[in-house]
């Protein structure tokens, strides 16, 4: 333990508690964003009470006289907390202590910044010249041109000069600068920017404002730079104290984000005696300096000032928790997490489940022993002050509200916005007559055959339109698929491939998933101590695809949570005083192995994998992938697997579309193409559904088998819309409906075929018992009833089941199939539930 005073003069280690007395996570007023941002050329109104002396400046001149530290102050006060001040209210690398009490630099104060002084100004503790850095930045901004520009473009304005003019035109506040461009133009400037981001970015802002004022002196907004795309991306588990106060870039997945926290920037006080309002007081390092007396000369009452909230100026702040992505976790390791601080425009740029790449400044902050104690712990907390956020992987699809047909407030996703050349290429690709086949061949090309399964998965990627009616009824547009089959039939490989493509995709295993792990659970926030709701796999997969392996090994409590998710697409929570309904608009892709590790074709799907019928009926497509021995098929499969190990294995897929093009194609279609049913397609859907229902009628019999349910026609609509999306068509046509019926029949013939009759029977999916099996059981029960009425008296002697079986064989005129003892037991159980018989062990008695 150490007190604030004992650590205040240290020259090594993390920032001193004098500059950082509380966590920005625990105290909303202690963020670097709390430092004041002034408009260019204006000065704040001075207060009339004493302020504490500023800490040492970041900049020191060569003659050891304390020079101005305007660039550092500008960065900390002028960036709204995005890259400037550092968490916990200032502080930072002890080699570069900073001052935030000095006025913000104005681009008009060139001489004070050292621009015209003969004595160079250096960053304190380094040999970095402020004048040299400013000159290098100015040269880069004015003269940088991309390498692909030809000689005719050499006389045009540079890349970032064009960006500045666009920002002025749209009255923006940010200019994104690619760090690779800085390195290509001036590697030394890049190294200084990464090592001393606070100082260099502050000078960057000054240069930008100088250029902006040269172009348009009436422009009042403070334009700032946002750096992204560093040359090296740091792993979360490799962060160490040497990275503190340096610019870093790392990738991860958002697992929790706080609500928007209002952070005060300027405070206004009012005297309770005379009603006098003070001038705005700048919040310094998260502290509000309350006037000890009324500032009005006629009043001067002590301790009479109170904060007036509606006259204060606030800014947005958000705390985000970032977790390592699964591909970065080493063998046997657990994922690491780090806290992010987002301010102003970066707030709500990411949602839980998003995979992002963050560029920011790694900061350290002290932790007090208690809220009322100035003593601090010797262990510091770390976090990242964010400068820039972008989507991490271009190989994943976008997840920006792709299926809501009535969502007019859709956000712009930069990753799906295409240039004219790529859009023209996609338009040409969509008009090819074999685009459907090419897309299916491009999906998991290393997996041999399974063409119909791949086409079903392709429809799941494109998805249908979610329909929200004015009456409040909602119809989902997500397609759910279940893969059932023998081990070694590429089920898990297909899941892994779809997981890599899907937006916000979560991959989980049924054996390792609990009910709360899939939906949501209540936990205690380690930073604030509050009870918060943590999102589970299905909620994190909102607008994406949740892949569940080993679906048959999931616990009953976990499976029961899927009923609401797969149809209503919400998760209802009522725990620990938290009552909420969370969105889980996700497609579910699950795979299951049959019990006994081998599929028994004589049993139904439900009997093979022991899943409840109510859950199984919510899947749009159920595919059986069986391992049937066949010499010709086995030879072709072996050749395909062996060919994958050759160097030129990819050359065999000449017509396949590469994964980057495929994901961008699917993302664009999901976001921009919303097909509607044409009259011809609607008539075909109606006619086809009626034909499916007619298939359950048998000539000469009054019994009918259910071969389709209303859920099937909803599945057909979703499949038809997905097929139209593949062609970039605004209308669903008849051939889309025909292909949707074919895909549904293929899946139903595999999973819903009654092997006793050879016909499709949806009762196998909905109830687990086919209509023919139910009729057979009814016949058994009727025969046993007749025998009991003939041979047994009410309350009389009992009969053994073996005797009953012999009687059935003698009097079984209506029974055309072989009779087994387990069939007799099922029929007796049916009669016992009706109260006609009582079963006592191996005997039955009439009651």
Curated annotation (Swiss-Prot):
Compositionally biased spans, kind Low complexity: 60-75
Chain residue ranges for the region called Disordered: 1-123
GO CC aspect terms: chloroplast; MCM complex; THO complex
Positions that bind ATP: 485-492
Any Pfam family the entry gives: MCM_lid
Coiled coil: none
GO molecular function, one term: DNA binding
UniProt keyword Metal-binding, yes or no: yes
Catalytic activity: ATP + H2O = ADP + phosphate + H(+)
Zn-finger (C4-type) residues: 271-299
Keywords assigned: ATP-binding, Cell cycle, DNA replication, DNA-binding, Helicase, Hydrolase, Metal-binding, Nucleotide-binding, Nucleus, Zinc, Zinc-finger
Main location, first listed in the record: nucleus
UniProt-listed Enzyme Commission number(s): 3.6.4.12
InterPro entries per UniProt: AAA+_ATPase (IPR003593), MCM (IPR031327), MCM_4 (IPR008047), MCM_CS (IPR018525), MCM_dom (IPR001208), MCM_lid (IPR041562), MCM_N (IPR027925), MCM_OB (IPR033762)
A GO BP annotation: DNA replication initiation
Bias-annotated ranges (Gly residues): 81-94
Assembly behavior: Component of the minichromosome maintenance (MCM) complex, a heterotetramer composed of MCM2, MCM3, MCM4, MCM5, MCM6 and MCM7. Interacts with ETG1.
Known role: Probable component of the MCM2-7 complex (MCM complex) that may function as a DNA helicase and which is essential to undergo a single round of replication initiation and elongation per cell cycle in eukaryotic cells.
Protein name as catalogued: DNA replication licensing factor MCM4
Gene designation per UniProt: MCM4
């Amino acid at each position: 333990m150490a007190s604030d005073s004992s650590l205040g003069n240290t020259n090594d280690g993390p920032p001193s508690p004098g500059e950082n007395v509380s966590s920005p996570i625990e105290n909303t007023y202690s963020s670097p964003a709390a430092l004041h941002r002034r408009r260019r050329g204006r000065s704040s109104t001075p207060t009339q009470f004493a302020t504490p002396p500023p800490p040492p400046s970041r900049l020191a001149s060569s003659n050891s006289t304390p020079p101005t530290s305007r660039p550092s102050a500008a960065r900390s006060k002028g960036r709204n907390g995005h890259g400037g001040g550092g968490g916990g209210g200032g502080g930072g690398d002890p080699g570069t202590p900073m001052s935030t009490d000095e006025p913000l630099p104005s681009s008009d104060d060139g001489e004070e910044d050292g621009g015209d002084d003969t004595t160079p100004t250096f960053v304190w503790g380094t040999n970095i010249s402020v004048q040299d850095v400013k000159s290098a930045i100015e040269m880069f901004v004015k003269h940088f041109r991309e390498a692909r520009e030809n000689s005719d473009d050499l006389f045009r304005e540079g890349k970032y000069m064009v960006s500045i003019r666009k920002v002025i035109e749209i009255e923006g506040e940010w200019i994104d600068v690619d760090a690779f461009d800085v390195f290509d133009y001036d590697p030394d400037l890049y190294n200084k920017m990464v090592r001393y981001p606070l100082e260099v970015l502050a000078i960057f802002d000054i240069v930008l404002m100088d250029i902006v004022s040269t172009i348009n002196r009436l422009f009042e907004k403070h334009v700032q730079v946002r750096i992204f795309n560093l040359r090296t991306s740091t792993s979360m588990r490799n962060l160490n104290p040497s990275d503190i106060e340096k610019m870093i870039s790392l990738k991860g997945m958002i697992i929790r984000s706080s609500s928007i926290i209002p952070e005060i920037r300027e405070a206004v006080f009012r005297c309770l005696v005379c009603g006098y309002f003070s001038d705005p007081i700048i919040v310094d390092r998260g502290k509000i300096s309350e006037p000890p007396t009324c500032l009005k000369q006629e009043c001067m009452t002590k301790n009479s000032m109170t904060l007036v909230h509606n006259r204060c100026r606030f800014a947005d702040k958000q705390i985000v928790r970032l977790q390592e992505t699964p591909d970065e976790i080493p063998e046997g390791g657990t994922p690491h997490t780090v806290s992010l601080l987002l301010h102003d425009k970066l707030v709500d740029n990411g949602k839980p489940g998003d995979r992002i790449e963050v560029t920011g400044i790694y900061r350290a902050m002290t932790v007090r022993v208690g809220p009322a104690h100035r003593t601090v712990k010797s262990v510091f907390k770390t976090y990242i002050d964010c400068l820039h956020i972008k989507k991490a992987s271009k190989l994943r699809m976008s997840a920006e509200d792709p299926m809501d047909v009535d969502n007019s407030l859709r956000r712009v996703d930069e990753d799906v916005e295409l240039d004219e050349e790529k859009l023209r290429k996609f338009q040409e690709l969509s008009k090819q007559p074999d685009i459907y086949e090419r897309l299916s061949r491009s999906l998991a090309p290393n997996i041999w055959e399974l063409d119909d399964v791949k086409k079903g998965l392709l429809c799941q990627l494109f998805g249908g339109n979610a329909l929200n009616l004015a009456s409040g009824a909602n119809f989902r547009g997500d397609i759910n698929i279940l893969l059932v089959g023998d081990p070694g039939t590429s089920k898990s490989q297909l899941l892994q491939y779809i997981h890599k493509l899907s937006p916000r995709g979560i991959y989980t295993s049924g054996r390792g998933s609990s009910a709360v792990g899939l939906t949501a659970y209540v936990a205690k926030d380690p930073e604030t101590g509050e009870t918060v709701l943590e999102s589970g796999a299905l909620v994190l997969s909102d607008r994406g695809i949740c892949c569940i392996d080993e679906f048959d090994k999931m616990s009953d409590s976990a499976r029961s949570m899927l009923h609401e998710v797969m149809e209503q697409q919400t998760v209802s929570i009522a725990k620990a005083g938290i009552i909420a309904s969370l969105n889980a608009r996700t497609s579910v892709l699950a795979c299951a192995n049959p019990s006994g590790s081998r599929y028994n074709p004589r049993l139904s799907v439900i009997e093979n994998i022991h899943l409840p019928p109510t859950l199984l009926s919510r899947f749009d497509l159920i595919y059986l992938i069986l391992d049937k021995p066949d010499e010709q098929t086995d030879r072709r499969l072996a050749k395909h697997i062996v060919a994958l190990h050759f160097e030129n294995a990819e050359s065999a897929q000449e017509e396949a579309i590469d994964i980057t093009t495929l994901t961008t194609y699917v993302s664009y279609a999901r976001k921009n193409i919303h097909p509607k049913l044409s009259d011809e397609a609607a008539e075909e859907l109606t006619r086809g559904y009626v034909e499916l229902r007619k298939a359950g009628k048998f000539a000469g019999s009054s019994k009918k088998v259910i071969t389709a349910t209303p859920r099937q026609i909803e599945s057909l609509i979703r499949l038809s819309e997905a097929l139209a999306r593949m062609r970039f068509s605004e209308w669903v046509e008849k051939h889309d409906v025909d292909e949707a019926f074919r895909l549904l029949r293929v899946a139903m013939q595999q999973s819903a075929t009654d092997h006793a009759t050879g016909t499709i029977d949806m009762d196998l999916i909905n109830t687990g018992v086919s209509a023919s099996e139910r009729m057979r059981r009814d016949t058994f029960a009727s025969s046993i009833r007749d025998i009991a009425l003939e041979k047994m008296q009410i309350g009389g002697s009992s009969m053994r089941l073996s005797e009953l079986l012999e009687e059935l064989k003698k009097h079984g005129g209506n029974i055309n199939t072989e009779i087994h003892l387990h069939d007799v037991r099922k029929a007796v159980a049916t009669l016992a539930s009706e109260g006609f018989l009582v079963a006592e062990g191996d005997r039955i008695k009439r009651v």
